């Protein structure tokens, strides 16, 4: 079969193996992306041959490397992995598939080990996972998760799960940590310039990131991480993830909003009609957003919104969020606020700052960063405007501009148990890069004078260990609600 025919029939043109997709007739192909055995790095398939022969268990932990007194890490997302991934059982079909892939891939395969998991454990991975409460804030260098195998025949399993487990922790935790920085900046601005900052804060940052990430699943995980701190989102998969994995009936809200295609479809000569249609269609909903720079943002705000539709907007009883989507990211939104003030008026709040008539507000979401946001907020304040006039939106800045090194996430082995039951410290300490040194010995986390602190488990001395069992041998031991996560993150 030639290369084009291989691809046409669902085969990988390099390995010749069938891949997971659906054939032209709609039937599923053979490869199973949900195969837990293959949810790892390739080289880990060889690790069952590499440990000391007397090994019975390996303990490993996840942390953000480095030391700091700054509390800047939000732990979130492990429960998504536990419910969506680790709750699946391995089958003999998975074992056969993994063996085929490993051999074709140039690696040994532990068929006996995986067959043992199927027969002795019903296919569920014999692991115990301990973790901090989800949503908790901590410093770098504090263990977030600790995992160990519960079956001495599966000493290699702790390392095998590293790829999937670390990925499941670093991404949502990094997104939640970054979004918290935005929340702190917005809170500061609102506390200075708004009368009810805590009431306003949850809706001040919208998530527009769904289209800018690599997969629907990533949008859901990152979108849920954003919702830990805010309630406004257009990443529907984030709402679904919070609903499915944390029991949140509705973790986020959206509102009707236009895009350029729905506005430019009317043509430039009917731009005012396009805006008027938005008012007539959506004013009863209470709030809606209209992108207004398809042609000329200044003309749209000053003339169409500010003159032609001014009385209609004021009489509608709703709030129109005007969204500029181009121009200088700092100057343009501030100018729009000033133009709306000139046309619709503003009142002074108790702190002495101007608040636009309730019928109009501004959304700025054109590729802004946290630094941009701070500049916009500072300029608004300098001109005497409250931060409540502006709602921000971020897309890739929330969900995509992040990687494992953003907070230096790592998972490392810290202890090995031998067949007599004795634990031995395991650690790494590279002579040329001390920052990559790992912790030795099984870990615990306690509350200290400066926040959470890592201590050895054998030095706990009666103190409460905040690393608590959340999963064991296929069973969820702690089911965090989204309300609990949000309360921790406040």
What residues fall within each predicted segment?
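Extreme N-terminal basic, low-complexity initiation segments
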Residues: 3-4
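Low-complexity, intrinsically disordered or signal/transmembrane-proximal segments
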Residues: 8-11
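Gly/Ser/Thr/Ala-enriched C-terminal appendages of enzymes
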Residues: 17, 26-80, 228-230, 235-236, ...
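Low-complexity, highly charged intrinsically disordered N-terminal segments
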Residues: 58-110
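Glycine-rich, N-terminal phosphate-binding loop and its surrounding beta-alpha-beta segment
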Residues: 89-147
């Amino acid at each position: 079969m030639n290369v084009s025919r291989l691809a046409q029939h669902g085969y990988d043109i390099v390995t010749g193996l069938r891949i997971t997709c659906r054939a032209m007739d709609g039937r599923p192909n053979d490869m199973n992306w949900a195969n837990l055995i293959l949810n790892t790095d390739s080289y880990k398939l060889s690790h069952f041959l590499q440990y000391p022969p007397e090994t019975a268990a390996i303990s490993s932990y996840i942390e953000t490397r480095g030391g700091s007194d700054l509390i800047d890490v939000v732990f979130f997302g492990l429960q998504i992995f536990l419910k969506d991934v680790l709750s699946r059982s391995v089958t003999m079909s998975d074992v056969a598939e993994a063996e085929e892939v490993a051999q074709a891939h140039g690696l040994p395969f532990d068929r006996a080990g995986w067959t043992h998991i199927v027969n002795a454990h019903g296919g569920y991975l014999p692991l115990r996972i301990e973790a901090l409460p989800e949503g908790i804030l901590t410093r770098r260098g504090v263990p977030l998760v600790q995992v160990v195998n519960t079956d001495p025949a599966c000493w290699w399993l702790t390392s095998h799960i590293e790829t999937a487990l670390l990925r499941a922790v670093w991404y949502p935790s990094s997104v939640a940590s970054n979004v918290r920085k935005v929340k702190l900046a917005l809170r500061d601005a609102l506390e200075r310039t708004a009368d009810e900052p805590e009431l306003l804060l949850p809706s001040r940052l919208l998530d527009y990131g769904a289209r800018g990430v690599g997969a629907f699943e990533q949008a859901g995980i990152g979108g849920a991480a954003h919702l830990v701190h805010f309630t406004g989102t257009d990443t529907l998969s984030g709402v679904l993830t919070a609903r499915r994995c944390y029991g949140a009936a509705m973790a986020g809200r959206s509102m009707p909003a236009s895009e350029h295609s729905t506005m430019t479809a009317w043509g430039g000569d009917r731009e005012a009609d396009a805006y008027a249609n938005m008012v007539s269609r959506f004013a009863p909903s209470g709030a809606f957003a209209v992108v207004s720079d398809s042609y000329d943002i200044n003309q749209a705000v000053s003339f169409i919104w500010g003159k032609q539709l001014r009385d209609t907007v004021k009489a509608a009883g709703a709030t129109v969020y005007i969204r500029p989507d181009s121009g200088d990211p700092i100057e343009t939104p501030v100018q729009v606020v000033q133009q709306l003030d000139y046309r619709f008026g503003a009142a002074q709040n108790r702190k002495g700052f101007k608040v636009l008539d309730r019928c109009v507000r501004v959304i700025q979401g054109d590729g802004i960063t946290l630094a941009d946001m701070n500049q916009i907020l500072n300029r608004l304040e300098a001109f005497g405007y409250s931060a409540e006039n502006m709602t921000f939106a971020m897309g890739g800045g929330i969900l995509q501009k992040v990687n494992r090194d953003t907070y230096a996430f790592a998972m490392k082995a810290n202890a090995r148990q031998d067949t007599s039951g004795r634990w031995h410290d395991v650690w790494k300490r590279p002579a040329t890069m001390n920052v990559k040194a790992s912790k030795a010995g099984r870990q615990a986390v306690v509350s200290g004078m400066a926040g959470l602190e890592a201590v050895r488990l054998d030095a706990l001395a009666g103190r409460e260990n905040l690393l608590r069992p959340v999963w064991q041998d296929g069973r969820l031991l702690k089911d965090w609600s989204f309300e609990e996560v949000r309360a921790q993150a406040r």
